[in-house]
């Protein structure tokens, strides 16, 4: 595929679809589909370069950069034109330290994403901004 992102079957049968096709299952084997990205394209930038880019977008400016999803557009749906983005700023929910759960799990510094403080109280806001924009 020429796209930087596509859908592919998780069963490994080799079938791929455009991310813009409304498909939920592989037409060849019935397997679920996952979003795949051109990792070679993403590796053209090192971690520090990605961090600088994402942190630079934290400064008030274009609305979609204020989204906790679209701030990372290159990792979500890089081929989507910016004018197609639809956002209410979802994804900017806090991380909360969970000491007791961390102790039970053997993770001394466990942090949990509090998606319940989002617009609808649901983690589904994160996926819906991508669905509506595409």
Q: Would you name each region that the model predicts?
A:
Residues 1-134:
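PLP-dependent amino-acid enzyme catalytic core
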